[in-house]
Amino acid sequence: AWKGFESSQPILNDEIDSNYPKISSDARWYNPVMHPATASRSAKDCPNANEFLWYLMYGEPHWDPSIWSIMKHLYDGGMWLKKLSVIAKDQHKTLQELKAAAPGETDYTKNYPSAPKIYEAYVKDNTNIKLGKPTNSSDYIFLPTFGYYLAGTGKLTFLGRYGYYWSSTPRPDGGLNAYNLYIRRDKVHVGYGDRTNAHCLWPE
């Protein structure tokens, strides 16, 4: 969202700057690809909607209050989740099987004409959160609470409280939303959000 305007990118919580993308002709504007197509630009390598549910349900989240740094500033708090390869091994599945269907065998990357609002069943929380860095941290990825940039203002919000991450799957029933995942101290959440907001890309 701030490519080419890094010098004005907000780096403190609740900081605002107007140099965010506002119109679709801006190269930084979100990709308007419609479901069931998948992301083809910056989010193309992010997990799909099915994989996010595997992270949510079998990632054994650990909240870690440790300090991390970004853009020359220090912040604290983030969530450890098991790597997808570890989840696949634990569940006796292949990575391709995790990509092809969520737990319960629904494939949220496909259209279901008889259930156009299937995304309503997608929204879920995991509140079974352990405290502290996992001892076998090499089996996990760390998601910092970087917050997100709010459309309409360019405001950096929820820094140090939430971390928002995009999937590679647009949400059906219109083209504005995509499936996402967020973390905070007491939960991991999967759902969907407005693509005009700027979320983080998946670190794995």
Residue ranges and their predicted role:
Residues 1-41:
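GGW-centered surface loops in extracellular recognition modules
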Residues 62-204:
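C-terminal, surface-exposed recognition/capping segments
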